[in-house]
From Swiss-Prot:
UniProt entry tagged with the keyword Transport: yes
Name assigned to this protein: Acyl-CoA-binding protein
Organism: Mus musculus (Mouse)
Phylogenetic placement of the source organism: Eukaryota, Metazoa, Chordata, Craniata, Vertebrata
Modified residues (N6-(2-hydroxyisobutyryl)lysine): K55
Gene assigned in the entry: Dbi
Coiled coil start-end: none
Amino acid sequence: MSQAEFDKAAEEVKRLKTQPTDEEMLFIYSHFKQATVGDVNTDRPGLLDLKGKAKWDSWNKLKGTSKESAMKTYVEKVDELKKKYGI
């Protein structure tokens, strides 16, 4: 998986004709963060930040996943979403 393919997918996901589901967005977010930052490096958001907690939890589940693996899974998911929602 090349950085160029990953960067292209990151741009394409912003142009989907229909907004993906929350679950799909969490998947995309967590794999993007794992590919670009690595393991979660922040404290878990507070009790009242439901969206922040969901994003953090989704990313934290990928702890230990390699950058390459996260990039590959991210690109595959974006390709799936492009077929499902169109660009």
